[in-house]
Amino acid sequence: MVSLTKKEAQAVIVHSESFPKSPALRGVAMGSLHKKDRIEWALEKAVELGVDYFYIYQADHSERARWKKSRLDQIILSASKQSKRTWFPELILADNLEYIKQDAHQRSQGIDLNLWAAHESASLQTKPPEK
């Protein structure tokens, strides 16, 4: 601390550290959950387990749910602080699984990618193109 008054505090940074982001990305795609507390709980647990990005999408036959992105971002921020993460996960609200498939290919950069839906008829498996 350099100086401290009732209206301001001044400090000098003595030391700083940089923590590089892990090259291995872990993502999760979640379909719409009707109850808001369930999606919030799932986000919180996924952050604690080390997920780097989330897709939340509206499935064709699920009830339409409305999420406030700012609220979900706050859940992620809070869980990240609690689990002492240096990088905050990214939240992506997607319209469908096709968007997730394309975006995940771009993020994976040649890493094997498997996407599975909960219902057998909706299962989707994909791998990046062979080099």
Locate the predicted segments by residue:
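N-terminal positively charged helical leader segments and presequences
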Residues: 1-18, 70
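Residues that form or immediately flank small-molecule/cofactor binding pockets and catalytic motifs
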Residues: 6, 16, 96, 120-123
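RNA substrate-binding interface of SAM-dependent RNA methyltransferases
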Residues: 15-116
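Active-site/ligand-binding-proximal alpha/beta "capping" segment
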Residues: 107-131
